[in-house]
Amino acid sequence: MSSPQHVIIGLSGGVDSAVAACLLIKQGYHVTGLNIRVLDTPEDTPTLAPSAMRISDSEEFDFPVFTLNLSAKFARDVVGYFHDDYLAGRTPNPCMVCNKAIKWFGLFEAMRLLRADLVATGHYARTELRDAVTRLLKGVDPEKDQSYFLWMLTQAELAKTLFPLGGYTKAEVRELARSFGVHAAEKKESQEICFVPHDDYCAYLANAIPGLEARVAGGEIVDQAGKVIGHHRGYPFYTIGQRRGLGVSTGEPVYVTEIDAEHNRIHVGSKADLECRSLIASGMNWIGIATPDKSFEAEARIRYRDRQSACMIEPMDDNRAWVSFREPKQGVACGQAVVFYDGDEVLGGGIIAKVNPEAPPQKILG
């Protein structure tokens, strides 16, 4: 009789990862927990350390847990990226980057060190092996589906990853937590970025980057004709689609339509001016399909809570893609991800590099 497969499960301290661990044990896996530390004092050489962390008082769900301090890597790859994107006039998505650079990096490092077979997380997503390809699918709960944040994962990573919660709703997970005696069964979810206090990114940036406010204050706010209609506190403190706090009066609502970091300038316009009919995405990662060499139709999401919309994707050189939408999208921000779907399956995605390019791409592959 073969021994059970050994799974490293990422534990955040919340209800989802705890229930995922319990389900793996119920399914017969040998489970080891990994709690990744990202806000501790950095270590020169991160090592696995035993932890007293327990998710339940039940002996059935008592399993070894280790911690891994990745604070230095987190500061560089996630916090540093967050700062750089705002300073470049983009809108970053740190949770998306953290999944790839921290969570899966740490899980695979623990899998290597502990000679385990698989890794698992509490994300609401699914995988399916079809035609010798591991497909990434949406979770069945449309309110909790987290597939949008996982587009950066590769075939090698997905083939070794389990998502125990993908077939459950959040309400069902809460009920399972209570039945398993999970300590975090009633713990509220946090929607905040873990290193940004009170989810106030403006105050955070002002404190985290010395001299930022003095350096960027007083830039111009211009309308769609280029006319100066006011001044702002600094371009990093604004986001695409923002309406409140602009301090300008035009007689009708205006929204941030463009952030020009080079000239410390904010462009504003009407809601119609926020429409995006096409974009260029860079850093493409294709999951369930080979890198395309000709245009094809799919559906796209340009933010986490966005609905899937029909689009045409045209591959470009330098691992980019031109994306045109059948119906215009609202408030598309550079720095966010555009993720492509075929129904429930994630095909891939990329980072939005340019919104409403002036002309169709000149160099298309194929």
Swiss-Prot record:
Residues 144-146, 303-304 are annotated as: Interaction with tRNA. The active site is at C98, C194. The keyword Transferase applies. The keyword Transferase applies. InterPro entries: MnmA-like, MnmA-like_C, MnmA-like_central, MnmA-like_central_sf, Rossmann-like_a/b/a_fold. Its EC number is 2.8.1.13. Pfam families: tRNA_Me_trans, tRNA_Me_trans_C, tRNA_Me_trans_M. It catalyses: S-sulfanyl-L-cysteinyl-[protein] + uridine(34) in tRNA + AH2 + ATP = 2-thiouridine(34) in tRNA + L-cysteinyl-[protein] + A + AMP + diphosphate + H(+). ATP binds at G10, L11, S12, G13, G14, V15, D16, S17, I36, G122. GO terms for molecular function: ATP binding; tRNA binding; tRNA-uridine 2-sulfurtransferase activity. GO terms for biological process: tRNA wobble position uridine thiolation. Its main location: cytoplasm. PANTHER family: MITOCHONDRIAL TRNA-SPECIFIC 2-THIOURIDYLASE 1, TRNA 5-METHYLAMINOMETHYL-2-THIOURIDYLATE -METHYLTRANSFERASE. Catalyzes the 2-thiolation of uridine at the wobble position (U34) of tRNA, leading to the formation of s(2)U34. This is tRNA-specific 2-thiouridylase MnmA. The gene is mnmA.
